[in-house]
């Protein structure tokens, strides 16, 4: 790969905190899907919040640790299967044509203008990888890497724990690259550089980001302008949801009355189940009755959240 035309910033010996600070300065491959709305883990709002330092660093989860630890295994497994050779780069790559972006790639191919992305995932995700040309969830990331590196193709190897090993090839498509990089540049110039947030969407990850950024409420009032139509729509939708929830409960109860003690029922092409499930819970009242001298309060975990409500004043 012709990486000599690009700027390299070595990541050898770099701490995780240093690496996180560096990746926040530009758009990376893992940000691409969120920017264009193809990720369930990120949105334009959350990427903006991350790049502008409003969100804390993500906790290093067990899944993330496994992904790093098994990256070398996935690469070796891919080489065994394909007969191709790869090597580490250990650097952030920057292309002067795209100053708003960087690439931190897993492996470079030896003797080929290409790269390799290594992934590990749960067996629950196996259906996403069977019988597909290229997994959608990793498509934007690999297009981003081809844009920054100038590679002609990008390979993807996915280890699904206990279920299979999948390999894919994505050929360079300049039109796709141009479209993605235009979207990334527009995102960077429109939102990150002027520190202007994108309009929040309705996803859970955006809701979590807002709750994190504005975790501590202040006892003050602000005047909202131009939101009256939206709030009126909100009130209508809440009423509609209440009516729909009521009808859903009514249908459920009618069917339960039909099934009685039976746990299974069929009707046309519908299969219905109403199964008995057990749930264990801790009885604080019984515990203190049996062990009155033990104080459990030091072990209670207090969580805080802000509750959103809209009250429509009657005129």
Q: Model-found features: residue ranges?
A:
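Accessory terminal regions of nucleic-acid processing enzymes
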Residues: 1-315
């Amino acid at each position: 790969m012709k990486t000599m035309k690009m700027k390299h910033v070595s990541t050898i010996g770099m701490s995780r905190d240093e690496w996180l600070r560096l990746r926040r300065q530009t758009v990376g491959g893992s940000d691409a899907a969120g920017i264009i709305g193809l990720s369930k883990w990120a949105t334009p709002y959350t990427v903006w919040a991350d790049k502008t330092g409003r969100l804390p660093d993500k906790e290093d989860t067990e899944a993330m640790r496994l992904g790093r630890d098994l990256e070398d295994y996935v690469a070796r497994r891919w080489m065994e299967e394909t007969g191709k050779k790869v090597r580490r780069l250990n650097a952030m790559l920057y292309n002067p044509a795209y100053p708003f972006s960087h690439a931190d790639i897993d492996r470079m191919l030896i003797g080929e203008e290409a790269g390799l992305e290594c992934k590990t995932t749960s067996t629950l995700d196996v259906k996403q990888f069977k019988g597909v040309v290229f997994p959608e969830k990793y498509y934007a990331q690999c297009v981003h890497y081809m844009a920054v590196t100038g590679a002609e193709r990008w390979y993807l190897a996915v280890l699904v724990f206990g279920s299979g090993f999948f390999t894919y090839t994505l050929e360079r498509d300049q039109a796709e690259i141009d479209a993605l990089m235009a979207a990334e540049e527009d995102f960077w110039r429109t939102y990150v550089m002027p520190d202007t947030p994108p309009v929040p969407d309705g996803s859970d990850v955006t809701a979590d980001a807002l709750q994190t950024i504005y975790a501590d409420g202040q006892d003050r009032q602000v005047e909202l302008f131009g939101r009256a139509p939206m709030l009126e729509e909100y009130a209508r939708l809440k009423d509609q949801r209440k009516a729909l929830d009521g009808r859903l409960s009514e249908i459920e109860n009618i069917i339960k009355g039909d099934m009685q003690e039976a746990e299974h029922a069929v009707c046309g092409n519908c299969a219905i189940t109403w199964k008995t499930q057990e749930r264990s819970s801790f009885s604080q009242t019984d515990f203190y009755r049996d062990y009155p001298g033990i104080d459990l309060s030091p072990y209670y975990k207090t969580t805080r959240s802000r509750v959103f409500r809209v009250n429509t004043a009657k005129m």
